[in-house]
Amino acid sequence: MSASYPALRLRRTRSTGWSRRLHAETVLTPADLIWPLFVVEGERVEQPIASLPGVSRWSVDQIVARGREARDLGIPCVALFPYTQPERRTEDGREALNPDNLMCQAIRALKDAVPEIGVLTDVALDPYTSHGHDGLVDAAGYVVNDTTAEMLVAQALNQAAAGADIIAPSDMMDGRIGLIRTALEAESHHNVQIMSYAAKYASAFYGPFRDAVGSRGLLKGDKKTYQMDNANAEEALREVAMDLAEGADTVMVKPGLPYLDIIVRVRQAFEVPVFAYQVSGEYAMLEASVAAGAGDRDALVLETLMAFKRAGCSGVLTYHAAHAAKLLNG
């Protein structure tokens, strides 16, 4: 920088609203958002989730209504997560392979009613297992990698056949991206994208999500043998490199705000779209601060989402998607 004060006044371009907009380095729009939605059985059902104030589980007909709302707000994609009734949960999570399971019903309904909306689907077994883990467990309670990966391939094909646009494996099994990509190609699902949860950390911020899908009370122990250690950053780059080499189109970092440094490093190291998941605990924490009078919801929502974009994200999965889109649309 050659100039100095007073010739250089950095406040000069901040002095008016139009100038601040003109010089903004980062732009946030509704097109940057993905809206996570929880699906439950029934008709005309809305079930508020106590640990996620303002978020509900919706029956399939109501999911379609949310899809129309997303379209009208300019949100390009919704993400689906099923609440599986306890009687449908098994040790092996076989309900994940049912072509008429809740996830597949919701996919078909959305693609029939709102075909212009992208549908992202979660690939993992935790919504379907009686033990709450993302994969199959052995007699010692260890989540086994390779047999789980085979099950995930079948789950991904089931969702793709129903019409899913983006398959998003969140399980963190080694090698599953390559297996899923090979299977999708073999079944002529050439345009089905894979968004890999490449850097998914074993985090304390997932609690409300587990309430939402009904797995919190089922889980024994933790997921530290397959999700990443929150002390590690270099390992995240290895995970991303592995998933890209196996055929992932985009990658995700999860959670979001506590891992902005990982987002920056991934974006700098790889010229691919990077997404973040502003997870349930982050959402609940923000809502709790608003309820305590510690800040303005609108300002906090937009500032946190802008932080993801500034760090290098192409988009953000956030439970605030509809609210943020309304703010951004004026």
Predicted regions located by residue number:
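Alpha/beta enzyme core
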Residues: 2-5, 16, 28-34, 40-330
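Exposed beta-strand/loop interface patches that mediate assembly or binding
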Residues: 6-12
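Acidic, Ser/Thr/Pro-rich intrinsically disordered transcriptional activation regions
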Residues: 11, 18-19
